[in-house]
């Protein structure tokens, strides 16, 4: 842990806050995965939008680059909590096994919200991958110039 702290230039308070944020994020992603697996509708959204998989990818990135956490405040404090709340609401309504036109409209609205949030999380991850790809391409060009 000390090596990690030193390598990433984290103060004791930075490390404590980082650990707290990452512990919470890990729990949230695990819980989101569990919720997703409880519903065919939620599984379908995940198969198309890849929100849970993308959240896991962002988590891995933040483990490797803790200084990047400041770039993911919307992901951490809005998108993940909101997709969890929406998934819980959807499953709660489905568990009641009541079906009216109003309930169907409400659940469809919730699913739409989940889809949009999932897509947005995947957009965040795609941006991450794109930035990494650009950095690698730039490094390659610099090496080629140096060697050429």
Question: Residue ranges of each PLM-predicted region?
Answer:
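Soluble C-terminal extramembrane regulatory/interaction domains of multi-pass membrane proteins
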Residues: 46-148
